[in-house]
Amino acid sequence: NGPFSLDITDSFFLQLKNKFRFVGFNQDCSNRPLSVIYNDFVKEYKYDRYFFFDDDTNVTDGFLSSKTNNSIDVSLPIIKSITDNKAYYPRVNNIVCEHDIFLNDSDYVISIGSGLMITSKLIDKFNAEQMTLFDERYSLYGVDFSLFRRIKMLRTKNIQINIEIAGELCHSLSRVDGCESTFRIRERSIDVVLTKILYPTENGFTNYLSILKVLIKTVARMDLQGLSILTYVIKHRAHPRSISYLLKRKYN
């Protein structure tokens, strides 16, 4: 996904072609929202299982062999930082999980998208509720978490969703592995504000306070452009890039 094209003679792509029977190569330099890309991916290709990986993830040799449970809807790996080899995700009931486990219906889990495996059974359950898996009001940060927030919504309707944690991956986590750029700080701020608006906690005051803190920090950094972006997000309840893309799709 843009903004720059990739070469089909790329060495990694050629290695994949030599290893697997079929490797598709799709790219879009329009820099579509990640949520839209994910949702379009599972709509276009009909398979039993779907895996998502970031380009800064190291996949271990035994990763796929840990994904053998046919009764699950979602499988998540333990995510360790490339820098310090510590586990940071998944978080089950706000505690980092560091071992393989089958989750209870009452457990609330969040994790990053890399290494995520979803099945066609999960997609069918979302389709039955006329919901997309990933919230397209998010564009970058927050896209992966939106899946788990939506799973929680389905569970409140007594819809059974089986989730396991199995295997592990090493991933470059920007907040752990180095200083964040202005771009990433802005994107994380958008994520916080959007989440407090779209998936608020029961304590309304806490939601408003969290948004206010983000705005104050943005002002303290003298980031007037960032403040303008956040004001736009609060008004339209979506990421600017998501709004732009969804409007184009609506009228095309």
Language model features: what each stretch is:
Residues 63-76:
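Conserved donor-nucleotide/metal-binding helix-loop-beta segment in metal-dependent transferases, i.e.
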Residues 48-58:
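Short beta-strand-to-loop acidic/aromatic patch adjacent to the donor-nucleotide binding site
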Residues 28-45:
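Glycine-rich, basic loop-to-helix element that forms the pyrophosphate-binding segment
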